[in-house]
Amino acid sequence: MELGLILMFASAFVSAKDRELEEFVEKDIKVFFSSYPAQVLGMEEDQGVLVSHSKYVNPSKYKFVTRARLVKSGERYVVIFGENNICKEGNSVVKCKEERPWDIDRKEFGYTISTDNKCITKGPDESIEMKPCVNTDDQIFGFKLADLGGCGSVESLLGSEKPKSTTTNVNIFQPESECLPSVMIKADGDVEKIEENDVHVLHKEGAHTHVIEEAGHPLYEESAPSKRRVVVSHRTKRSHLPGTRRTYLGHHHFPHHHLPHHYRNRTLFERKPVVF
């Protein structure tokens, strides 16, 4: 029973490993060190050797191609950088024309790439060496789709491809009117300051009524004359609060079609008291 469970889990692990690696087969990918994600593998075209460079270097300056591809060959994989296969030659990895498949094995934090029991290993500086597989950090690699990592064609990696322009679609909706239909907004320069001498008491009407004529322009109005008459009627009524007086404002002297909107307050028309 225990042996059956072990075989089942082993089979599930191998299946999961195969499915994960299959995501990168026959696709443009980037190969990087799992423990050094800023260090990527690439082919130096002038020397024809596999090296490690920082992903921040200018590919056109170093003629350094990071676009890679895995092609399945039986249970192994042909590894291609740029347009060239890579092969083991002594303790180095070089470009070659013939197909020499590699073993790609799943480890806890990535993959090893090996042949003849030797793994691709990070050497001093940017060099790459072939050393016995010991599953150390300098032998464990990760894969990433080139499109997601900002890597594209060989031309883009060499800096010879023209940059592609991008377009952002923005929908702009123009309002039917820039202002509310019943409100015209004046600029600050059109607003005149009301001076004290712009308000004149013309005459008193009765003991508790007087007429005030004032000049000035409100900031928001439909159409208002330069001068308007305001009738304030004072009617003393008994207040619920001691020491307060209620004043009612009348509106019968306003022409209806010239009424500014701020005088069209419901409290004015309904003659509700204003408590001072």
From Swiss-Prot:
Source organism, top-level taxon = Eukaryota
Q: Where is the signal peptide?
A: 1-16
Tell me which UniProt keywords the record has, alphabetically: Glycoprotein, Signal
Give the positions annotated as glycosylation sites: N265
Protein name from the UniProt record: Uncharacterized protein ECU07_1090
